[in-house]
Amino acid sequence: MIDEAVQQLLDGFVTSVREVAAVQAVWLHGSLALGDYQLGRSDLDVIVVTSAPPPAAVADVHRRLIRDSPLARKLHCSYMTELTDQSVRHPTFAQERYFDRPVTPVTRRELAIGNRTLFGPTPAELLPATTDEELFAFVRRDLRDFWLPATRKRTNWYADIWVDLSLLTLARAHVTLATGDLITKRAALDVLPGLGAPTSVVDDIRARRYGPVPRTWPWWRHRRGVLARRFTSTAIPAVLS
């Protein structure tokens, strides 16, 4: 069940975006679709399917929602007019800015698994299926071409988001490549010890996502970043082998 405040935000978003764009469907993916949503911590991942390119006014919709509700800062939305070609970059509002990005095979598989619609037909009715080959190729490419090179840079690893995403992405990739399944972030935390991840870093991620947020001292940020970077750099080749 979706939290009442989140449901109100999503309902308001659907109403507002339908007033300015030719909306065919509005879908949920990510933690909202897979049952791992954490209020105030998780993003609100949304796809809007439109029959024509979205007008500039959709950015105004997002900015107005942000002014009215702090939760709206977490609302990330891509606007899709082309559902078949996975290489197409779609207008997206996320992190309080407007840019273009593809809807990845992982997102497409999440949409299919959750099959959650806020308006219009479900993903199963409109979205072409993502094959395991497409999913595996993307997961391998993401580890090889993005995360492995990122381990050669030191500065990013002091940020919470880099520590969290690196380890969680790695664990989820390991399971996907081994079984074809997509798992939640909560499940990924349980996988990490078996991959040799530092226990202190796993506990840190778990506390910040699911428990009382701990105070983070500068020395720990440095130590945590070193541990996360070192683990990621050695674990990726093993997962890809």
Predicted regions: what they are:
Residues 19-22, 40, 71:
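Short, structurally constrained coil/turn elements
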Residues 1-5, 59-160, 167, 173:
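Conserved NTP/Mg2+-binding pocket subregion across the NTase superfamily
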Residues 1-27, 56-58, 241:
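Helical scaffold of the NTase/Pol beta-like nucleotidyltransferase catalytic core
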Residues 125-241:
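Nucleotidyltransferase catalytic cores
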Residues 35-38, 85-90, 213:
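Short, solvent-exposed polar/charged micro-motifs at secondary-structure junctions
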Residues 28-65, 74-81:
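Catalytic metal-binding acidic patch
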